[in-house]
Design a protein with these regions (language model features):
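Residue-level marker of positions within ordered structural domains that often coincide
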Residues: 13, 45, 152
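Bacterial N-terminal signal peptides
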Residues: 7-20
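A contiguous strand-loop segment
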Residues: 24-125
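Positively charged n-region of N-terminal signal peptides that target proteins for export
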Residues: 1-6
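Alpha/propeptide regions of enzymes that mature by internal proteolysis
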Residues: 32, 123-157
C-alpha cells in the first residue's frame, strides 16, 4: 500500500469520528406508479427516535387546538376518518397520515425556516399548533382543493 493511503484512511476515520453533525429534520418523498397510484414515505431525522405509534381517528372524533399560551384554540370534529403516526398520548399531534378520501398530510421539522403567526386575542379561537395542522387537514378536507378553500379557517400559532 502506498504511504498516502494509510494517512488518508486515518484522516477519514478521525473526520467521521470527530465531526458531529446531528441530524434534526425530516425528508419526505412520493413515488407515482405508472397506473397513477402514489406511495408516500418520510424520514424522522432526530438524535433519538420519537415515541411514536399508529392511531386511527374515526369520523366524529373531537379535537381542540393548542395555543402557545396553553389556552384552547379551535374546536373541531373529524368529518373524515383518518389514520397516521402520532407522538402524543391523545393522538392529536399527527406526524403524518392519510384520510378515508386518500388525502395525505405530514408535518416536517424546519428549524430556522418555518414561521408561524403570533397568538393574538383575535386569532386564538381559530388557533392550533404547527404539529396539529396535519390533524386538522385530514379531519376536514377531502382533497387539496378543499385544503386551499378551508385553510383560512385556522391560524397556525407558534
Amino acid at each position: 500500500m502506498p504511504p498516502i493511503r494509510p494517512f488518508l484512511a486515518i484522516v477519514l476515520i478521525l473526520t467521521c469520528g470527530l465531526v458531529d453533525h446531528p441530524a434534526c429534520g425530516c425528508t419526505g418523498t412520493a413515488l407515482v406508479a405508472k397506473d397513477g397510484s402514489v406511495v408516500v414515505g418520510r424520514t424522522l431525522e432526530f438524535g433519538m427516535p420519537p415515541d411514536s405509534h399508529l392511531i386511527v381517528h374515526p369520523v366524529g372524533t373531537a379535537f381542540i387546538g393548542q395555543t402557545p399560551s396553553g389556552e384552547s384554540g379551535i374546536a373541531f370534529s373529524a368529518q373524515y376518518g383518518f389514520a397516521g403516526i402520532t407522538v402524543s398520548d391523545d393522538g392529536s399531534l399527527l406526524l403524518d397520515g392519510t384520510n378515508e378520501k386518500g388525502l395525505n398530510a405530514a408535518v416536517f421539522y424546519f428549524p430556522g425556516y418555518a414561521k408561524f403567526a403570533e397568538a393574538t386575542p383575535e386569532n386564538r379561537k381559530r388557533g392550533l399548533s404547527p404539529m396539529q395542522l396535519s390533524t386538522w387537514i385530514l379531519a376536514n378536507c377531502a382533497n387539496l382543493a378543499e385544503v386551499k378553500q378551508k385553510i383560512d379557517q385556522v391560524a397556525v400559532l407558534g
